[in-house]
């Protein structure tokens, strides 16, 4: 069973599972387009993390549950029907685990965040932490995948990185290094863990290069020939913004708080947790070349 299959990561997990010949059922929220999933051969069932009864029906007869669902991606795309962090990422995930336990599911694969972000005080990160704790207390075999930042998200205009125009917003000092990872690589990892005979309980996966935002800009400049104009947002401004936004918009407030946490120290995610699964991770330079070639 896959929950979150219409999202950025979930759609790629579905494709990887289908390619491996796995019998797949996907939970699709009412009103969402599941044609691409049907084309993969997946069985669709209507459900919502806010509707425990629908989750019980979805889990019936299932061996393994994989979930990538969250409210942030949909919210940033303008979907105001997706629900809140409290209802979906905290209570919804807890309800899904309960449904899986009741149905006798054997394994639960969950996408999470690095531990440093879980300690950020961001509501979204706290929901991830609560779900990890709930899984640890469960009788189900759990596999937690803590992923570093997605290349497709962090090197996009959505977060102020406009490589075409040569403009970038740097939050905080911009010195801490992350292992920016391809969504496809994370998806292939989750698909592999869903069917592995004896998977590890925890993986902390990242890309092959430890890079600061300035390092990443240098790579894009070398590939595209475009220098960057940088707008830096100081940490005190971010702190005030996180407190102000957190009161009116917990989702955007969470993003700012997690950005503050990521700016404090280098990521502990490991490329070895990808390569151990037989995955050759895509580098940031490869991604920059891919984007550059797509526009020529």
Spans of features found by a protein language model:
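Oxidoreductase cofactor-interface core, primarily capturing Rossmann-like NAD(P)-dependent enzymes
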Residues: 1-25, 29-32, 36-39, 52, ...
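Structured catalytic core of nucleotide-sugar glycosyltransferases
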Residues: 16, 67-69, 281
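NAD(P)H-binding glycine-rich loop region in Rossmannoid oxidoreductase-like domains
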Residues: 28-102, 117
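Short, amphipathic alpha-helical "lid/cap" segments that border enzyme active or binding sites
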Residues: 52, 56, 97, 183-191, ...
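A hydrophobic C-terminal alpha-helical subdomain
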Residues: 64, 235-296
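Short beta-strand segments at enzyme active-site cores
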Residues: 106-112
């Amino acid at each position: 069973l896959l929950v979150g299959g219409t999202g950025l990561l979930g759609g790629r997990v579905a494709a990887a599972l289908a390619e491996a010949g796995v019998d797949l059922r996907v939970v699709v929220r009412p009103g969402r387009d599941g044609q691409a999933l049907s084309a993969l051969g997946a069985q669709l069932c209507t459900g919502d993390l806010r509707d425990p009864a629908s989750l019980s029906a979805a889990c019936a007869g299932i061996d393994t549950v994989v979930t990538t669902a969250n409210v942030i991606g949909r919210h940033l795309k303008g979907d105001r029907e997706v629900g809140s962090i409290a209802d979906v990422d905290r209570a919804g995930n807890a309800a899904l685990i309960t449904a899986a336990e009741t149905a006798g599911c054997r394994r639960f694969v969950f996408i999470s965040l690095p531990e440093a972000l879980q300690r950020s005080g961001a509501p979204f990160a706290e929901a991830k932490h609560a779900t990890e704790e709930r899984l640890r207390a469960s009788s189900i075999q759990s596999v937690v995948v803590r992923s570093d930042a997605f290349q497709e998200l962090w090197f996009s205009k959505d977060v102020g990185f406009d490589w075409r125009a040569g403009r970038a917003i740097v939050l905080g000092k911009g010195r801490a290094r992350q292992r920016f990872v391809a969504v496809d690589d994370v998806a292939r990892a989750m698909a592999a863990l869903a069917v592995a005979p004896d998977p590890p309980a925890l993986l902390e996966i990242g890309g092959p290069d430890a890079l600061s935002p300035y390092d990443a800009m240098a790579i894009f400049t070398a590939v595209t020939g475009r220098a960057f104009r940088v707008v830096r947002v100081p940490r005190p401004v971010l702190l005030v913004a996180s407190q102000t936004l957190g009161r009116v918009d917990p989702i955007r407030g969470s993003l700012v708080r997690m950005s503050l946490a990521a700016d404090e120290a280098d990521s502990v995610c490991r490329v070895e947790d990808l390569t151990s699964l037989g995955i050759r991770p895509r580098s940031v330079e490869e991604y920059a070349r891919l984007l550059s070639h797509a526009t020529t």
